[in-house]
Amino acid sequence: IHRTEKQMIAHIIGDRVISDITRDGISWINERIKRPAYIWWNFPVSDYVRDHLLLGPVYGNDTTIAKEMSGFVTNPMEHAESSKIAIYSVASYAWNPAKYDTWQTWKDAIRTILPSAAEELECFAMHNSDLGPNGHGYRREESMDIQPAAERFLKAFKEGKNYDKADFETLQYTFERMKESADI
């Protein structure tokens, strides 16, 4: 690989088909190609989890490797509109990785993409971000806002104990919001 023409761009996807881009991974490839790699990040592409929308925050890529890359692009989902949150976020990351703010960028993307229903889109996206089990082992966090209540409720249910009313109400409220948000 190191003998390839210097004018050629070497698109690299990371150390697996889908993974976060790490310092170790980019150092490994740069040593072999003898120049900064051009990253083709396989996210939010979802052709291997077609029943999922990947609308959550973009996170996990090293924010200190800008000088080790010659470029950074995203591989979007087959759903153009649904890819916009991630495309916006990846563009922000690629523009200045050191100053990339996962949550602020995600919220900015949502407000930019659908300003008339940003709250609804945020609710829908918050609960549509994980890939689910897949052959690549790549996962994203999902429904973090209700995770503690959901875990406590599920534990009580499995143990045949009474659930906490506040947890139930939190989950019920969120599920109603999710239903309404999906219908905008």
Regions found by a protein language model. Give the residues of each.
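Catalytic-core regions of glycoside hydrolase
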Residues: 1-103
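C-terminal functional modules
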Residues: 99-184
